[in-house]
Every structure is written in structure tokens, then in C-alpha cells.
Amino acid sequence: MFHCIPLWRCNRHVESIDKRHCSLLSVPEEIYRYSRSLEELLLDANQLRELPKPFFQLVKLRKLGLSDNEIQRLPPEIANFMQLVELDLSRNEIPEIPESISFCKALQVADFSGNPLTRLPESFPELQNLTCLSVNDISLQALPENIGNLFNLASLELRENLLTYLPESLTHLQRLEELDLGNNELYNLPETIGALFSLKDLWLDGNQLAEIPQEIGNMKNLLCLDVSENKLERLPEEISGLTSLTDLLVSQNLLEVLPDGIGNLKKLSVLKVDQNKLVHLTEAIGDCESLTELVLTENQLL
């Protein structure tokens, strides 16, 4: 059970307030008493519908949690939060992010997942301190062409959107370690995707991919590659270059053979190739000396 303690019982110099799961219909007025000291405000899982003007006087905020509410608008005054480092607005009813978000220069972690957004503001790539960005399940149709300006990004989650292509600048994200593009409408990948040398986890499941560019073999640090539920008829021989790979998931595709180069994946421990059209298995798979899980069900193996 959650107990929401009245703030007037607390010290006037308050740096953190946690009012999660308190059935709040509006932002408590007493919070504004601490505008000179408040750095962390957690109002997640309430029933908030709007953020009033006094809310944006909390200019010392460094962490703001507003997930799982019913907020219908993010006002341009969000620009006041110039010291904000973490922002969670996931699972609300916000239809757009104002261009003024670009003034939140200190922002490092942002989650806008589960809102009825169709686009990110053009100014968004100006948030160059961002390291983690989550925009899952928001009906996103395209990324800003200059998304590559977010050069400090380490994690980018774009799952369950309506993306049909990736801008070339995406491959400028040289510090990116996690990229989740699962359940979109991607038909192809840019050849330059192989330039994401720091990438460790790449999820491309549930798209419309018919092929993977051979340049993917340049991702020497990749640990997990998920391309299941696509329309792949072959894997490039260059996949042999993924020498750090531990998990390769290619279930539910149209593969008839696996490339011989798969035998070079000495660290591969999980290989899932179920629900394809395999008619035989390359002997090279015997060279995958770390393999502990091999799934081949629902193929046409003789």
C-alpha cells in the first residue's frame, strides 16, 4: 500500500518528492513551495491531465517522472527545465513535443513511449547530451533527417512504430550500443549501417526486410542480432565478420540455407532458425564451438 505523506510535515528544503501511485488528479499545490530546492519529482502512475503554468517554475529539476498519467499536452514552457537530466513522459496522451524541448540542453535520458506522436520535433537533434532515447509505440512515421547529430546516444529504442526507412545520418551515431527497430515497416537498411561499430544489440524483428546489407559484417562488437519475422531469403556471407556475436535470431523468414561463414562465429551460443525453408544444414555449423541452443523446428530438412 502506498502512503502519500502531506508535504507540510516535511522540511522546507526538499530536494526529492515521490508521489507515485497516489491517485492524484492534479499537481499538488504544496509542491511549488520547494521550487528553489526541488531536483527530483516523481508523479508517475496518477491521473494527471495537465501541467499548470506554476509547474514550470520548478527550474531546479534534474529528474522528472510523469509516466502512466493522462497528460494531453506538453506546453512550450518545458524549455524552462534547462537543468533536467532525466524525463519520463511515457504512456500519456501527448500528441506532439514542442520545438522548445531543444532548450533542455542537459537532458540525457528521455522516454516518450506510448504517446500518440507521429513525429519528433525538427529541433530534437539539438539535445546533444542525450544518451538514452525511448520512443516505442508512438506511431512514429519518420525520424528527423539529422538524427545523427545526437552523437552521444548509447541507446535508441524505436520499437512498434511505422518507420519505413532510416535516414543516412543514423549511422553517425558512433557511440550507439543498443538499437531497437523491431516491429516497424522497414523494407531495407542503409549500407552504411555497418559503420555503427559500437553496436552491441540490434533488434530488427517484425519488419519487411528481404535482405541484410553485407556491410553488417563490420559490426565487430555486435553481441545480439534479431532479424526474426522478416522476409529474408538469405544471410550475407559477411555475417562471418560478427566475431563477438552470441545470439543470432532468424526465426520466421524464408531462408533455404545458412552461409558457410557462420562457422566463424566462435562465440555464438544461441541460434534460432525455426520456421524457415531450410533443406539442409551447412557442416560449418559444427565449428560454432560455443553453441548451446540450436532451434531448427518447422523447416524442410531432409
Describe the function of each predicted region:
Residues 1-302:
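The feature captures the LRR N-terminal capping module
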